């Protein structure tokens, strides 16, 4: 499974990237706005840091302008994936941009029907939003499972990029089901290391070392 980090914070990306935890990055205008910097400037800096795909989102809602924005975004770096919404115009833009040879991440997916359309339109990634489905008492993981089954049935190459990840359990369940990629905030990825028994065991270990006055350096 590939790990994408969902942020525009340069320091957070660098920390995880240094550990080999970053296979890509997802951004959106809201995340970049928090940084207080220019969208092109921030995206270019992220692309220089990370070898994998960096999703940069269009701001338009009509196909023609989405295509124009997408073509401008891919000029930033060769690892840009143009992020478009799962609307009819978004699918039109996806088809054109993918035919041009560019990576496209179709976002805001909430149904298997939508995911099927995105794959047919040539999407590189489909981003089903798990947490937002859970928020309205629907099963986000069931959607991941349905998409996995459909894509496997017909050999679609579109990668399932599980998004709106709220917890480490979302990551684990996505891995069990077979999502190709997850994208999560840095804090959620870092929380994967935590377990109370690890903390308890380390405390006991350190107490034993102190009692025995063991030193290596």
Swiss-Prot record:
UniProt-listed Pfam families: TAL_FSA
Active-site residues from the entry: 83 (schiff-base intermediate with substrate)
Subcellular compartments: Cytoplasm
One GO cellular component term noted in the UniProt record for this chain: cytoplasm
Role: Transaldolase is important for the balance of metabolites in the pentose-phosphate pathway.
Listed GO biological process terms: carbohydrate metabolic process; pentose-phosphate shunt
Keywords: Cytoplasm, Pentose shunt, Schiff base, Transferase
Primary site of residence: cytoplasm
The protein's name: Probable transaldolase
EC number annotated for this UniProt entry: 2.2.1.2
Catalytic activity: D-sedoheptulose 7-phosphate + D-glyceraldehyde 3-phosphate = D-erythrose 4-phosphate + beta-D-fructose 6-phosphate
């Amino acid at each position: 499974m590939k790990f994408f980090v969902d942020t525009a914070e340069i320091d957070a990306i660098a920390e995880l990237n240094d550990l080999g935890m970053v296979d890509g990055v997802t951004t959106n205008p809201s995340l970049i706005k928090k940084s207080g910097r220019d969208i092109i400037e921030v995206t270019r800096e992220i692309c220089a840091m990370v070898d994998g795909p960096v999703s940069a989102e269009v701001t338009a809602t009509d196909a023609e302008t989405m295509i124009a924005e997408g073509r401008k975004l891919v000029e930033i770096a060769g690892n840009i994936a143009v992020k478009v919404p799962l609307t009819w115009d978004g699918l039109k833009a996806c088809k054109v941009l993918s035919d041009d040879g560019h990576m496209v991440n179709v976002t805001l997916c909430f149904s298997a029907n939508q995911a099927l359309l995105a794959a047919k339109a040539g999407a590189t990634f489909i981003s089903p939003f798990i947490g937002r489905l859970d928020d309205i008492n629907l099963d986000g993981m069931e959607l991941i499972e349905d998409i996995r089954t459909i894509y496997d049935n017909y050999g679609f190459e579109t990668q399932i990029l599980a998004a709106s990840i709220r917890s480490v359990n979302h990551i684990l369940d996505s891995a069990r089901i077979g999502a190709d990629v997850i994208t999560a905030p840095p804090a959620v990825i870092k929380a994967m290391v935590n377990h109370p028994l690890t903390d308890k065991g380390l405390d006991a270990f350190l107490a034993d070392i102190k009692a025995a006055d063991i030193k290596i350096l």
